[in-house]
């Protein structure tokens, strides 16, 4: 009699995706982040569901409903902080996952990569709308500033902003629709994740060498299930340290002040995971130019397969490209720091130089390094 997991129509899909999946024998810890992202998504949906049971999306009661969750609901404080800091963990894993894809040339799986970029946009949109929901000062002004960027679109900009707001300013209608979208988007993200995995399992996983690994595969279970579980334990350890010891470390103190349209905070800034893009936006004096640079800072990932000039897929054996990659990582840290600073000298010029370097490395220097390495190795 055949094993049920191999014959049952539903279990068969799970078996081919998680148990008997042939995986390269040499994939490193950098391949853990996919499963960690799945766990983060599950955690966010679960904690978000419990928060939604107590939250009210009304401008008069939103702030006090979040306070009520933290003070009066059983374990409400831990659910709220797991959700807020879980988002930070989500983005840490997301950035490392994308970085891994860039380093090891995983972008040559076009469909998987492009769905991944769409997922990145969807997660960023969800996180932005979630940040508006507590209706603190930074929620309100962050929503006002970021939605206002759409007014830079010629001709239809102003109408588009008012349509998104549901009025002439960020108000009750805006909060209600942001809550609705924030609730539905994670389920759309889950559907996209399934498509992402579907495309990945069509080709099989990449590996650190970038070479074909068909000759050397091992079953996913037990080898990589154990490895993934270790990843979960480490991630939850860091998350719980953050939640239980310093839950507000990554938040903004201004968000503990109820939203007031008559009082602007001294420095309007988004959550830390958007600061690099925010710095690129601010580095261009023109509004439309800034918005385009902001979108391009993420959309540039779609161009990576077209910009790949090297005969080798991975950066593992390419020292010049490796140097450029780590300069790019340092540049992103610089942009994140600049995004949190006020718009004054010397931060303006540092931000502008870091923004130029970001696009220069991805669009110019990396492809040139690939050609140079081919020449050096006579490929």
UniProtKB/Swiss-Prot annotation:
GO terms for molecular function: metal ion binding; ubiquinol-cytochrome-c reductase activity. InterPro entries: Cyt_b/b6_C, Cyt_b/b6_C_sf, Cyt_b/b6_N, Cytb/b6-like_sf, Cytochrome_b, Cytochrome_b_C_euk/bac, Cytochrome_b_N_euk/bac, Di-haem_cyt_TM. Keywords: Electron transport, Heme, Iron, Membrane, Metal-binding, Mitochondrion, Mitochondrion inner membrane, Respiratory chain, Transmembrane, Transmembrane helix, Transport, Ubiquinone. Its cofactor is heme b. Binds 2 heme b groups non-covalently. One of its GO terms (cellular component) is respiratory chain complex III. Heme b b566 binds at residues 97, 196. A ubiquinone binds at residue 201. It is found in: Mitochondrion inner membrane. Heme b b562 binds at residues 83, 182. The chain crosses the membrane at residues 33-53, 77-98, 113-133, 178-198, 226-246, 288-308, 320-340, 347-367. It is a multi-pass membrane protein. The keyword Heme applies. GO terms for biological process: mitochondrial electron transport, ubiquinol to cytochrome c. Belongs to the cytochrome b family. Heme 1 (or BL or b562) is low-potential and absorbs at about 562 nm, and heme 2 (or BH or b566) is high-potential and absorbs at about 566 nm. Component of the ubiquinol-cytochrome c reductase complex (complex III or cytochrome b-c1 complex) that is part of the mitochondrial respiratory chain. The b-c1 complex mediates electron transfer from ubiquinol to cytochrome c. Contributes to the generation of a proton gradient across the mitochondrial membrane that is then used for ATP synthesis. The cytochrome bc1 complex contains 11 subunits: 3 respiratory subunits (MT-CYB, CYC1 and UQCRFS1), 2 core proteins (UQCRC1 and UQCRC2) and 6 low-molecular weight proteins (UQCRH/QCR6, UQCRB/QCR7, UQCRQ/QCR8, UQCR10/QCR9, UQCR11/QCR10 and a cleavage product of UQCRFS1). This cytochrome bc1 complex then forms a dimer. This is Cytochrome b. The lineage of its organism: Eukaryota, Metazoa, Chordata, Craniata, Vertebrata.
């Amino acid at each position: 009699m055949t094993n049920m997991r191999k014959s049952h129509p539903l279990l068969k899909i799970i078996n081919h995706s998680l148990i008997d999946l042939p995986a390269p024998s040499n994939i490193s810890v950098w391949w853990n982040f996919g499963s960690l992202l799945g766990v983060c998504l599950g955690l966010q949906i679960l904690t978000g569901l419990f928060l939604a049971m107590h939250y009210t999306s009304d401008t008069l009661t939103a702030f006090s409903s979040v306070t009520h969750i933290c003070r009066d609901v059983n374990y409400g404080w831990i659910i709220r902080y797991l959700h807020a800091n879980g988002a930070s963990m989500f983005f840490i894993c997301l950035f490392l996952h994308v970085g891994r894809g860039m380093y090891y040339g995983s972008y040559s799986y076009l469909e998987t990569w492009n769905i991944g970029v769409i997922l990145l946009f969807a997660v960023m949109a969800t996180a932005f709308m979630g940040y508006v929901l507590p209706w603190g000062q930074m929620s309100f002004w962050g929503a006002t500033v970021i939605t206002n960027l759409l007014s830079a679109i010629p001709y239809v900009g102003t109408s588009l902003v008012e349509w998104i707001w549901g009025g002439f300013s960020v108000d009750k209608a805006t909060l209600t629709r942001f809550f609705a979208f924030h609730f539905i988007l994670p389920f759309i993200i889950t559907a996209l994740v399934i498509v992402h995995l579907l495309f990945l399992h069509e080709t099989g996983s990449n590996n650190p060498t970038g070479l074909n690994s068909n000759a050397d595969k091992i079953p996913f279970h037990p080898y990589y299930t154990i490895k993934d579980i270790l990843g979960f334990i480490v991630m939850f350890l860091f998350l719980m340290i953050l939640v239980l010891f310093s839950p507000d470390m990554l938040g903004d103190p201004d968000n503990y002040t109820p939203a007031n349209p008559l009082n602007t905070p001294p420095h309007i800034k988004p959550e830390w995971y958007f600061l690099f893009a925010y710095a690129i936006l601010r580095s261009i004096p023109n509004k439309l130019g800034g918005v385009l640079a902001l979108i391009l800072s993420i959309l540039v990932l779609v161009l990576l397969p077209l910009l790949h000039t090297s005969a080798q897929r991975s950066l593992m054996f390419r020292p010049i490209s490796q140097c450029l990659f780590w300069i790019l990582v340092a540049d992103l840290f610089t942009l994140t720091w600049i995004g949190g600073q006020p718009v004054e000298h010397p931060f303006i010029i540092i931000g502008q130089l870091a923004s130029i370097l970001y696009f220069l490395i991805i669009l110019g220097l990396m492809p040139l390094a690939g050609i140079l390495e081919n020449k050096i190795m006579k490929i």
